[in-house]
Amino acid sequence: MLCCMRRTKQVEKNDDDQKIEQDGIKPEDKAHKAATKIQASFRGHITRKKLKGEKKDDVQAAEAEANKKDEAPVADGVEKKGEGTTTAEAAPATGSKPDEPGKAGETPSEEKKGEGDAATEQAAPQAPASSEEKAGSAETESATKASTDNSPSSKAEDAPAKEEPKQADVPAAVTAAAATTPAAEDAAAKATAQPPTETGESSQAEENIEAVDETKPKESARQDEGKEEEPEADQEHA
């Protein structure tokens, strides 16, 4: 084995020597070249990283600038929209001004409606009040009529109507009845002139009835006296 190893080593050395002779380059030089290559590649790698970082920074800066540019048109659009809304709001505000006269014109009509409603409301209570007053006046009139119908004046008027046939036969009795009836009529007129009340009417009716009852005997006595005076007058004429 050792013999084989030695032989192979010698062969390899011989091969290396032959290559060196052919190339004319020593192994040290090859190593130096390889080191320089490695260093160069490493430097290149570093520079590439730097370039990439710079590029990234440049890319980021470019992206930021692009974003700013994009944001600027958006802001302009927003401002334009805000201006559009302000103009739209100003337009309705200006449009509402001509409507204000219409509203002002509507307010008098509304006031008129309110006055009309108030007038109707006032007329509604007045109408029942007037109807109540009419009913009260009708009741008072009916009461006065009933009192006048039941008053002694009517009875006094009926009494002279009944006595008219007797007075036609006795002229002297007519004068006596004429003298007595005005007093009864005056009493009846006074009784009717007074305001009718429930208690007053009853008392006055009783007084008038008593007065009529008192006047009837007087009238009959005067009629008898008139009858007695008639023959005496006839005798005197004869």
Swiss-Prot record:
GO cellular component, one term: presynapse
Subunit structure: Identified in a complex containing FGFR4, NCAM1, CDH2, PLCG1, FRS2, SRC, SHC1, GAP43 and CTTN. Interacts (via IQ domain) with calmodulin. Binds calmodulin with a greater affinity in the absence of Ca(2+) than in its presence.
Keyword field contains Magnesium: no
Lipidation (S-palmitoyl cysteine): C3, C4
PTM comment: Phosphorylated. Phosphorylation of this protein by a protein kinase C is specifically correlated with certain forms of synaptic plasticity. Palmitoylated by ZDHHC3. Palmitoylation is regulated by ARF6 and is essential for plasma membrane association and axonal and dendritic filopodia induction. Deacylated by LYPLA2.
First-listed, main subcellular location of the protein, grouped into a coarse class: membrane
Record-listed Phosphothreonine modification sites: T181
Membership in a protein family: Belongs to the neuromodulin family.
Gene name tied to this protein: GAP43
The protein's name: Neuromodulin
Taxonomy of the source species: Eukaryota, Metazoa, Chordata, Craniata, Vertebrata
SMART domains linked to this entry: IQ
Protein purpose: This protein is associated with nerve growth. It is a major component of the motile 'growth cones' that form the tips of elongating axons. Plays a role in axonal and dendritic filopodia induction.
Biased segments, Low complexity type: 84-95, 119-130, 168-199
Membrane topology type: Peripheral membrane protein
Keywords: Calmodulin-binding, Cell membrane, Cell projection, Cytoplasm, Developmental protein, Differentiation, Growth regulation, Lipoprotein, Membrane, Neurogenesis, Palmitate, Phosphoprotein, Synapse
Record-linked InterPro entries: IQ_motif_EF-hand-BS (IPR000048), Neuromodulin (IPR001422), Neuromodulin_C (IPR017454), Neuromodulin_gap-junction_N (IPR018947), Neuromodulin_P_site (IPR033137), Neuromodulin_palmitoyl_site (IPR018243)
Gene Ontology BP, a term: radial glial cell differentiation
Transmembrane segment boundaries: none
Modified residues (Phosphoserine): S41, S151, S153, S154, S202, S203
Cell membrane as UniProt keyword: yes
